[in-house]
UniProtKB/Swiss-Prot annotation:
Quaternary structure annotation from Swiss-Prot or TrEMBL: Part of the CMR ribonucleoprotein complex, consisting of crRNA plus Cmr1/Cmr2/Cmr3/Cmr4/Cmr5/Cmr6 at 1:1 and possibly 3 Cmr7 dimers. A Cmr2/Cmr3/Cmr7 subcomplex without crRNA can also be isolated. It does not cleave target RNA.
Database matches in CDD domains: Cmr5_III-B (cd09654)
InterPro entries associated with the record: AF1862-like_dom_sf, CRISPR-assoc_prot_Cmr5
GO cellular-component term (any): cytoplasm
Organism the protein comes from: Saccharolobus solfataricus (strain ATCC 35092 / DSM 1617 / JCM 11322 / P2) (Sulfolobus solfataricus)
One Gene Ontology term from the biological process aspect of the record: defense response to virus
Protein purpose: CRISPR (clustered regularly interspaced short palindromic repeat) is an adaptive immune system that provides protection against mobile genetic elements (viruses, transposable elements and conjugative plasmids). CRISPR clusters contain spacers, sequences complementary to antecedent mobile elements, and target invading nucleic acids. CRISPR clusters are transcribed and processed into CRISPR RNA (crRNA). The CMR complex degrades RNA complementary to the crRNA (target RNA) within UA dinucleotides, generating 3'-OH and 5'-phosphate ends.
Major place of residence: cytoplasm
Protein name: CRISPR system CMR subunit Cmr5
Length: 156
């Protein structure tokens, strides 16, 4: 990976973290911090797709899909309230992953949002197809998210 790509990953991590930080209340931020610490390791232990399935199952998309798509569509200045539940922290971590994939043009944002709303199975199939590329490229970004969460989110 080139130095320019690394810088882009760090910049994206800061942008995504800022959006997530502003979308969660204090309790959910603490939970997100745990997700950021655990999920990056889980992706490289269990694999991207099994971990993604787990995150999706915990994110409560059946009830909160509109919040996730709104966050993906929002400019960085607009705040979306994801809430304070465990689901919110998983949804925030799912957002972090999907944000990277769309902003780095690994997957088209319009396709991503459309499939989140209308056909998640087709989206999962596409992510499965791209998983070798995703796994190879996303680690530095997720590590940056982890470090930001550890540095900026206090736990009681």
């Amino acid at each position: 990976m080139t130095e320019v790509q690394e810088e882009k990953d760090y910049k994206l991590a800061i942008e995504a973290f800022n959006l997530v930080y502003n979308a969660l209340d204090k309790k959910a931020r603490e939970k997100f911090r745990s997700r950021a610490r655990d999920m990056v390791e889980e992706i490289y232990t269990s694999g991207f797709i099994p971990t993604l399935f787990y995150i999706i199952s915990k994110a409560g998309l059946e009830n909160n899909n509109d919040k996730l798509t709104a966050l993906l569509n929002s400019p960085s200045s607009k705040s979306i309230d994801l809430g304070s539940s465990d689901e919110a922290s998983y949804m925030a971590y799912l957002f972090v992953i999907l944000y990277y994939l769309s902003e780095r043009n690994i997957i088209n944002k319009e396709f991503l949002i459309n499939k989140l709303k209308n056909n998640r199975l087709e989206l999962i199939d596409k992510l499965y197809e791209l998983s070798p590329i995703i796994s190879a490229r996303i680690k530095r970004y997720l590590m940056a998210i982890k470090r930001l969460a550890e540095a900026l989110i206090e736990v009681r």
